[in-house]
Amino acid sequence: MRTGLITAALTLIPAAAFAHTGAGEAHGFVSGFAHPLGGLDHILAMVTVGIFAWQLGGRALWLVPGSFVLAMAIGAALGMAGVALPFVEFGIAASVIVLGGIVAFACNAPIVVAMGVVALFAIFHGHAHGSEMPIDAAGGTYAAGFMLATALLHAAGLALGCAIGRTTEGRAGYRLGGGLVALAGLAILANTV
């Protein structure tokens, strides 16, 4: 009963209010935070980075996601500066395909290789974030927003990787999940062509 009342009350909130996040510093942070969460391609890639890091274990748990966030910041700076980067949408779609495949096949790459792979893809994701920054958003807080959202998506991937790995069918779960992510990446790629 109580859940039903809360749900009914929430439906009365005008959705248009969520389309306007404000102006200035707060606007920048909220817009930046929302950007990675607004695209399935970003969500799939970033959560899958966390799962990949979990599969590798050890220092990869923080080095792999950390290299993604750092490289994404570099890509965003390029995008904010108006530096053209070819094939951004293709690179983002490829990241979903490749990362899904890496998880599905449980690729046991050296940490430095894993960091390089995710960093390469992160440049494309970052460029998309940076080049799509709202004109009235503050750059620093916008970047802080999408970097925090990305780190949280990585953390969700780490938690999901842990949860899948603890099941008796963990290996099959990684294969199925990674395969579905790769298939979604193919659909995203087909949509960008």
Which stretches of residues belong to each language-model region?
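Membrane metalloprotein/metal-transporter helix-bundle signature
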Residues: R2-V193
